[in-house]
Amino acid sequence: MNKAHYKKSIIALFVVLMYLLISVAFAKILPLAVLQDLTNSNIIRRILYDVIQAAAAIPFAATYFRSADFRKTETHSKLIPWGLIGVCATLVTIILPERLYAFWFYLIIVGCGEEFVFRGYLHRELRKAFNFKVSVILGGLVFGFAHGYSYFMIQGGTITGILSEFGGGIVGALVFSAIYEKSNSIGWPILIHACLDFVGYLI
């Protein structure tokens, strides 16, 4: 194992955990309305938080776009998922205009935010030091912890709910990491992640 890659993978785990803790702490400081309860009186605070949350993911996105993984991705693999995202956004605007903010939340904050942090940065760094299985296990534990911890701290969830979020995060990490590696593009896991969560929100 390359010691430099091993060291970078440890740093990546630490950075992502710090990002998670700060993000959740900020959400606790700035109480937020859930998407279903947005009104003219509370939407500004929600937008402010979401903009800051999106901005916090920019450094992770930048590391991906500077990486060899992005440069070696074929053009169609880069463009097709983003084209489909544009189609989805258009359809939501026409069919469900009252859910447009929720769609962009799940696309930018959940899809882009989580995938750039966990696949575009963490998984990519782990893969330099470990094989796919080990990378998914380590990344999955962090991804599961992120969901369980935020659910507990922000929503005060039950033990069953926390364990469900933790397990779902691990399974999600496996699925999205496999999609990322198979497609060699961050666009596909972003699209699928955002669509799954948005559909879950609608249901």
Model feature map: region roles:
Residues G83-L91, A173-L174:
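Hydrophobic, membrane-inserted alpha-helices
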Residues A25-D37, L91-R99, G148-I154:
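Juxtamembrane "helix-exit" motif on the non-cytosolic side of transmembrane helices
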Residues M1, Y19-A33, V51, A55, ...:
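Hydrophobic alpha-helical transmembrane segments
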Residues M1-D69, F198-I203:
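N-terminal, membrane-interfacial amphipathic/helix-forming hydrophobic leader that caps
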Residues L96-I203:
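Transmembrane helix-loop-helix hairpins at the membrane interface
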Residues N2-H5, R66-S77, H123-N131, Y180-N184:
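Membrane-interface helix-boundary motifs at transmembrane edges
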Residues L30-S41, T73-E74, L126-I137:
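Membrane interface segments of multi-pass transport proteins and intramembrane proteases
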Residues K8-V16, N42, R46-D50, K78, ...:
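Residue-level signature of transmembrane alpha-helical entry/exit and packing/kink sites
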